[in-house]
Amino acid sequence: MKVHRIVFLTVLTFFLTACDVDLYRSLPEDEANQMLALLMQHHIDAEKKQEEDGVTLRVEQSQFINAVELLRLNGYPHRQFTTADKMFPANQLVVSPQEEQQKINFLKEQRIEGMLSQMEGVINAKVTIALPTYDEGSNASPSSVAVFIKYSPQVNMEAFRVKIKDLIEMSIPGLQYSKISILMQPAEFRMVADVPARQTFWIMDVINANKGKVVKWLMKYPYPLMLSLTGLLLGVGILIGYFCLRRRF
């Protein structure tokens, strides 16, 4: 009797959770809460689960595409930027001046990318700093900066172009304003309408909408369910065996 009950509860759990899929894993607690709140605000059913390596966000499979797109358009999950402690660890061996300069330059790029990513509407930001080059006559070409910003079409990012250039100019000493190049590109909406997706009748939608009634019914009639599942598994096994024999002969 105990074995039957364990099998029944396992099957029941599978039916009630089979339509949920992982959205993101290993998230920090605060970021997971922000993402969950954003999804709930847009009526996307989601839940979080604490794991050993962080928080896992789960959503219904039918809402997976819209959940990913909604978070993407709002810059989630956030990029992890390199810090000076990681670039210059205390136990690091002595590096060449050229390598040290490259690391410092990379940290500057990361710092500017981090500031731009904090702006409302910025999905992704990339910054490249070209260091001065010297010719044979010791004449140095000035530094230049190239910036690429992918932003949400819900925000008029072009209105901030001048302020972004001012921010970059002040972040790099000696940089000429005319040597700053910025390319902005709006992201495309790839969200799907929720209504057409619901026109198809799925038994899992019914189960989710009536979990309490389903649980009571299954607890009252566990054996018919077990017999049905056994027949289903047997039928699947027969089909697999049939196709394997056809491929062999």
From Swiss-Prot:
Leader sequence segment: 1-18
Disruption phenotype: Disruption prevents SpvB-induced F-actin depolymerization in human macrophages without affecting intra-bacterial SpvB protein levels.
GO CC aspect terms: cell outer membrane
Bilayer disposition of the protein: Lipid-anchor
Superkingdom of the source species: Bacteria
Lipidation (S-diacylglycerol cysteine): C19
Compartments it resides in: Cell outer membrane
Gene3D superfamilies: 3.30.300.30, Hypothetical protein rpa1041
Lipid addition sites, N-palmitoyl cysteine: C19
Biological process, per Gene Ontology: protein secretion
Transmembrane annotation, as ranges: 225-245
PROSITE patterns to which the protein is assigned, alphabetical: PROKAR_LIPOPROTEIN
Pfam families linked: YscJ_FliF
Record's keyword annotation contains Cell wall biogenesis/degradation: no
Induction context: Induced in low magnesium. Induced in macrophages. Expression in host cells is dependent on an acidic environment.
Record key words, sorted: Cell outer membrane, Lipoprotein, Membrane, Palmitate, Protein transport, Signal, Transmembrane, Transmembrane helix, Transport
PANTHER family reported for this sequence: FLAGELLAR M-RING PROTEIN, SECRETION SYSTEM APPARATUS LIPOPROTEIN SSAJ
Its biological purpose: Component of Salmonella pathogenicity island 2 (SPI-2) type III secretion system, required for secretion of some type III-secreted effectors including the SpvB toxin.
Family: Belongs to the YscJ lipoprotein family.
Protein name: Secretion system apparatus lipoprotein SsaJ
Gene: ssaJ
